[in-house]
């Protein structure tokens, strides 16, 4: 639950390091694997004093997932996450948004018997815009270190922070990338088609995960669907979804799914 008043929002709602307005339509709830999609307890402020511009900043409760062992534990976090974004809109269905996040991730080492922190960061650009009267484009790109918690495909891998094989008793934040691009074609005011391709990628650093060849390296996502807005309060659709996962040993698996 959350509450908004005088451009302030407090409570549990969608996070500041994402762009709901640039997400393509999918029946799949999470959406593209390279998109950022999450909720957080937060205090945020939105400034709308400039025509066509919107600026937002938030302080969010941190959620850190890491690859731990008998040597490491994720500690109670000492700092919130900080996000900021700026958005320019040139009509009701077209905008460009840039944003960023910075976070401090705390862990404890059983060898050192003390808490340490790793700094993570992320940058993001997203857009949606008209291409004539029938087409709508969507896109987003995200890059950073230690932002796995926010990327759809990587959020379940516990890789916000991981052990550093080259520094005994230390953990590190790995680089990661996520992006998507999609198109929507409006057949009529009530019926539209859309298709999106997306990718998320985890990069190796300081020898991790050289000894874990089955670790996720990158994933790909393709979706195509059709929607019919039967009434203002009722929408039906059908969707084909295909996903691929490739590990650091280059083994690849895939799956297909139909959604209604």
Annotated model-derived regions:
Residues 6-10, 51-57, 93-98, 134-137, ...:
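Repeated loop/turn-to-beta-strand initiation elements of outer-membrane beta-barrel proteins
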Residues 129, 228-230, 253-260:
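Outer-membrane beta-barrel "beta-signal"
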Residues 89-216:
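Detector for outer-membrane/organellar transmembrane beta-barrel domains
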Residues 34-38, 75-81, 114-120, 170-176, ...:
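Transmembrane beta-barrel outer-membrane domains
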Residues 1-5, 18-31, 68-70, 106-115, ...:
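Surface-exposed loop and membrane-interface regions of Gram-negative outer-membrane beta-barrel proteins
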Residues 1, 39-43, 80-84, 121-125, ...:
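Hydrophobic, lipid-facing positions within transmembrane beta-strands of outer-membrane proteins
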Residues 15-26, 140-159, 242, 249:
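Outer-membrane beta-barrel translocator/channel fold
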Residues 1-65, 78-79, 83, 87-90, ...:
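Outer membrane beta-barrel
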């Amino acid at each position: 639950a959350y509450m908004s008043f005088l451009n302030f929002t407090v409570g549990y709602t969608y996070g500041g390091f994402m762009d709901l307005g640039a997400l393509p339509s999918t029946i799949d709830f999470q959406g593209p694997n390279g998109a950022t999609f999450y909720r957080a307890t937060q205090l945020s402020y939105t400034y709308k004093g400039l025509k066509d511009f919107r600026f937002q900043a938030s302080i969010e409760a941190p959620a850190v997932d890491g690859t731990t062992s008998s040597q490491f534990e994720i500690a109670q976090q000492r700092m919130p996450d900080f996000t900021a974004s700026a958005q320019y809109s040139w009509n009701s269905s077209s905008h460009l948004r840039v944003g960023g996040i910075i976070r401090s991730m705390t862990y404890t080492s059983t060898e050192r018997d003390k808490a340490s922190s790793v700094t993570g960061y992320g940058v993001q650009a997203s857009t949606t815009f008209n291409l004539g009267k029938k087409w709508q484009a969507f896109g987003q790109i995200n890059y950073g270190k230690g932002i796995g918690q926010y990327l759809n495909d990587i959020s379940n891998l516990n890789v916000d922070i991981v052990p550093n094989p080259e520094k005994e008793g230390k953990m590190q934040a790995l680089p990661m990338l996520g992006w998507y691009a999609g198109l929507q074609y409006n057949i009529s005011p009530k019926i539209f088609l859309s298709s999106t391709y997306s990718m998320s990628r985890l990069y190796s650093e300081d020898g991790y995960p050289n000894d874990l060849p089955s670790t996720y390296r990158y994933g790909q996502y393709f979706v195509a669907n059709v929607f019919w807005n039967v009434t203002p309060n009722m929408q039906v659709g059908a969707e084909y979804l295909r996903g691929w996962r490739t590990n650091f040993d280059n083994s690849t698996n895939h799956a297909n799914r139909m959604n209604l």
